Amino acid sequence: MVQSMDDASPAKWHLAHTTWFFERFVLGADPAYRPHDPQWDYLFNSYYQSIGPAHARPHRGLLSRPSLTQVLDYRSEIGTRVLAQLQAGTLEPQTLQILELGLQHEQQHQELLLTDIKHAFWRNPLGPAYRADLATQHAPASPLRWLQRDEQIGEIGAAPWPAHAGFAYDNESPRHRVLVPAHALASRPVSNAEYAEFIADGGYRTVGLWLSDGWARRCAEDWQRPLYWHADGAREFTLGGWRERDPHAPVCHLSLFEADAFARWAGARLPTEAEWEQAAAGVAIVGNFVDTDALHPQSTAPADTGLQQLFGDVWEWTGSAYLPYPGFRPWSGTLGEYNGKFMNAQWVLRGGSCATPRDHIRASYRNFFPSDARWQFAGVRLAKDSA
């Protein structure tokens, strides 16, 4: 039940909340269903205000009851009931669609569970490892190359689900045309070594590199390096505990503010989400995902052509605010609260990370976080305007 900060949630809460989602929206679709415990609507609802009030996120760590044993029993009970209805073929088509959404929702929380555990263990003075057996891979980074892309009018986004086959969140739709001016994208994400140069050059002390709110946050919280880098300059905290930092691996746990400041220092900028998605179109979704079981960004062998590590390793901050696409329509009913109401004061990230399930990601996937969020596996790929 450890909760290391207001933005994180205890592992027990993640387990209960994802189970509650199936109970509330799948089993609860039957008017005759009686909930496991009506009070849990309050405890494990996250933000669905149309259902009713929810226990405040900063206080989730105070929920000593129900116990972990009770939560695990709850997961077993609800899972058994859902599986029985699925096997019996008694679920309505609309409920089956919600079941699919529930599986996608569970995958999102699998990643959040890992990032929240990592933050909690880092806050522990002992620096415990979540997985002491995690292997590390050290390979020399490819030279950073600039890949020129011509101006084009193309399409981004996804066809609305479930009207069209293939799951996509409502914030990914509708598919629409965009004009993308000529630009260049970096061949790979920024490495730890490159980010260390930014620090050594006074990047965290140079106000002119920072957005105003970013500089204020940097000063208020005394940011001097990425979240999990040790002050000794050589180590970083991982889910395997404190480890020597691989200079060639993608830098991670950056806020939007830090990513933007680095880009300015490098004479570049962050890519727009349209630039990113058009570059990703047709690129195979392979990379270092949670399925790889590294649970940390990895350096890869040099490659001569193409974009490297576009998927997996680190979510890549874009310079695009999280806003609705033209013609956006949220899902109907309570599930309309899933994405649309958060379309303010957040920024889009793309590509997935080492904590993302491989089959959860796609080129059109829009992750989003506030500009000061640092505890996710977020890094940066640079872009430049073409002359």
What spans do the regions from the language model cover?
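Alpha-helical, largely C-terminal catalytic domains
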Residues: 82, 86
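A conserved hydrophobic secondary-structure block that centers on an alpha-helix together
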Residues: 89-97
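Functional-site microenvironments in short loops/helix caps that host divalent-cation chemistry
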Residues: 102, 106-108, 112, 116, ...
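Disulfide-stabilized, aromatic/cysteine-rich ligand-recognition loop
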Residues: 1-9, 13-21, 25-81, 96-111, ...
